[in-house]
Amino acid sequence: MASFISDFGLIWYLRELNKKEFMKFKDFLIQEILELKLKQVSSTKVKKASREDLANLLLKCGENQAWDMTFRILQKINRKDLTERATGAIVGNPNLYRDHLKKKLTHDCPKKFNVRIQDFIKETFIQNDXDAFENLLISKGTERKPHMVFLKGMAGVGKTLMLKNLMLAWSKGLVFQNKFSYAFYFCCQDVKQLKTASLAELISREWPSPSAPIEEILSQPEKLLFIIDSLEGMEWDLTKQESELCDDCMEKQPVSTLLSSLLRRKMLPESSLLLSTTPETFEKMEDRIQCTDVKTATAFDERSMKIYFHRLFQDRKRAQEAFSLVRENKQLFTICQVPLLCWMVATCLKEEIEKGGDPVSLCRRTTSLYTTHIFSLFIPQSAQYPSKKSQDQLQGLCSLAAEGMWTDTFVFGKEALRRNGIFDSDIPTLLDIGMLGKIREFENSYIFLHPSVQEVCAAIFYMLKRHVEHPSQDVKNIETVLFMFLKKVKTQWIFLGCFIFGLLQKSEQEKLGVFFGHRLSKNIHHKLYQCLETLSGNAELQEQIDGMRLFSCLFEMEDEAFLVKAMNCMQQINFVAKNYSDFIVAAYCLKHCSTLKKLSFSTENVLNEGDQSYMEELLICWNNMCSVFVRSKDIQELRIKDTNFNEPAIRVLYESLKYPSFTLNKLVANNVSFGDNHVLFELIQNSSLQYLDLSCSFLSHNEVKLLCDILNQAECNIEKLMIAHCKLSPDDCKIFGSILMSSKSLKVLNLASNNLNQGISSLCKALCHPHCTLEYLVPRSNHCIVNFLLKLSCCGITERGCQDLAEVLKNNQNLKYLHVSYNKLKDTGVMLLCDAIKHPNCHLKDLQLEACEITDASNEELCYAFMQCETLQTLNLMGNAFEVSRMVFFPRKSELMLFIFLHLSRLWITDFDNEFQAFLLSVKKKNHFLTIRGSVEADGEKKGGDSDARTMGELSNEI
């Protein structure tokens, strides 16, 4: 009986007692205490205790004794219903639920999964995954905090099956023993069909009988595990105020609000959560949700694929023939990492080989495999063409798929099926052939075989009909599809655009024509090219285009003439190549591009992976990608991010960029590793280069020396140097100091987020040097003074460093912008700066003092300093304990601050109240050029970087 306390909690039962019964319970309890001579519990405290307090007092006696006393007293006050319920709960409810789950999950083989592939996945993954999840969700040592674990992986990789396998293991007692009394699985695609619900209702849907013991289930939330699958299927607003969320498990809410309340710990904060989603959705949510761990759902590796091919074919020679085709085709190989798609590809190849077809031709492009698989489901083996009914059924599915893509629906009810021409009598056939699957056994909710199958069906719809012929007004035209796909507006559109282009292949058009029995419109080619043509010359629109998606579309189309025309619409491209397959696609397109002016890319770790088996082929692709620098002679800007180069790869890049005719103006290499090769420093010797950004790329002391040697060369014209987050040391400052004294071109130096500390002194001495040549920005006028910018945010500067900075402000009249946010300057250091700001030689325009630990002790000095510096236009005081509003309303300072504000053009502050806001509104009326930005709460956790990068709401629409 002791498990009653730990499993269900005493408090719920005490709350079931009315006031009179509760008083009787206390009286009997006092008698028990006296009879048993229990010293742990005071009779006086029992008399005064609330229900919650009484539960805690009882537990001091130990769980066994607490239960024994509670059980006896409930019988004495004639609440046998509670004792019976508790006894039933202890023995029955958890076991009843586990048995229900065990039966449901053991026999749950929905048609959407081929049984063989499902069994294979269970056999391959379940034990490893069960152990991993147990480690992630069980507290270590004495730690008791609830867990929130994310499972992320690409769509269709098998996350749902993994979670259901975990549920099955829990129901069998193989994992989480004594950790969770209940584990509930909610799928967002399923749940969002309800529109509104309470948590109690969601739990009841999973219960084996109509009446779930909700109170008992929720009585001890730390024993609950909620598994929430497919977060990408729900619209989330994680910016809602906490007051807009819900903590009542019985209250109906919009399901997105209900699940947000769980995720953000407003509801049942003691419970544990296991969440699954795609990497894209995880990226959007990770900053908003405090998760404890992240697990990546691993796809099929090569060994697993090979084993599965052999099991399916049961003919060693044919299995090897089919798998070799997949292994040689990197796009197919990538697709086969998704278990269900591996089954689909293997099945297609098996059928093609068995009927004596051409499997090589089938494997040329991904679209071909999908259409071959889908059409084969609707054509009986004995027939050559589909029946009229089969044509109508597939056309209805394509209409349904298109509606789902536009409404973010992947679970459909019967009404949606009927609206799109699928009758009730069609459903058994569609379930039987595996095009649809049931998501819940006893409800009329249906899903496609796989999200990518829904996407290819939606693409087929656009080959058959115009959007105005669709029964839903949500469905838009093909041009809108293309732009939304290329701009990644809808994260769940993974292949849609690629399939549309793939279906325009001549062979696919013929295949569609044969299946549906009529010729298709040839106008779609022209429409898509017109879309791409609108990109030409539109820099803002091109900036939004995901280059890899554009490449994938053109690759799938396999039309070189169209490819050349399309690529020459682009003047700038931004892409991320995450694997070998992406390299093949990018190389195919970039080698035909000759109009680029701006290129931005990331190759992550692809060029420096340990697996050398395909490095030679990879470098051929890399050569083709870099040929764009030879073809596009007008590239002015190159941005490389998050990339690890090996020596051959960086050498290829250098050889492509070194031509004298190549006049690169701007080079950005953020978080880039060039290995031990110093080719980078050969690259930046290009005399046309004016902007160099190496932020977040580690620079050794020797590399800093090499960099500065180049900056010292007479032919070097670099004006802006960004080296934030480069792990520079104080010793490096001496080297940069020499640059400041000798460089005739350098105007902007950003050293933010490097631990410079005492090195600031060397920099400041250089800035004060009489031979410092920072004089001219552009030689148009002999009187054009440099607006020199110095960024030292988060550099470990203390009060001592302010003394050196103060000397710079007094001696260097060219210093217009000083950013020293996120340094511990404190009042002492700021007062030194204030003294310098008042100096007649100080011409500062922009001063950033965000989060510098300034207090009210500095406000008077700041007032007078700002008043005397007539050039100051931008002031940032956010994130300090210092209140600007006090400066205004202290005696003698209101007029002074008004004077200052009337001369500023930008003011950033924090902690304003209504009275101060009214003052600012009055200032705004007098100074129309003033932009005021603020934050009610300072973001004290931000570390380093540029204050300009912050996003802050306006104080009001008027301000």
Swiss-Prot record:
Compositional bias of kind Basic and acidic residues: 939-951
Gene deletion effect: No visible phenotype, however female mice produce fewer offspring. Delay in embryo compaction and blastocyst cavitation. Disorganization of the mitochondria in zygotes around the pronucleus and subcortical region following nuclear envelope breakdown. During oocyte maturation the endoplasmic reticulum and mitochondria are aberrantly distributed in the nucleus and cortical region at the germinal vesicle stage, in the subcortical region after germinal vesicle break down and dispersed throughout the cytoplasm at the M2 stage. Loss of cytoplasmic lattices in oocytes.
Domain Pyrin: from-to ranges: 1-92
Gene Ontology biological process terms from the UniProt entry: actin filament organization; establishment of organelle localization; in utero embryonic development; inflammatory response; positive regulation of embryonic development
One Pfam family linked to the record: NACHT
Chief location of this protein within or outside the cell: cytoplasm
Domain NACHT: 147-470
CDD domains: Pyrin_NALPs (cd08320)
Region entry Disordered, spans: 938-959
GO cellular component: cell cortex; cytoplasm
Coiled coil: none
Cross-referenced InterPro entries: DAPIN, DEATH-like_dom_sf, Leu-rich_rpt, LRR_dom_sf, NACHT_NTPase, NLRP_HD2, NLRP_innate_immun_reg, NOD1/2_WH
LRR repeat ranges, renumbered to this chain: 593-616, 632-656, 686-709, 715-738, 743-766, 812-835, 841-864, 869-892
Keyword list, A-Z: ATP-binding, Cytoplasm, Inflammatory response, Leucine-rich repeat, Nucleotide-binding, Repeat
Protein name, as recorded: NACHT, LRR and PYD domains-containing protein 4F
Tissue specificity annotation: Expressed in the ovaries (at protein level).
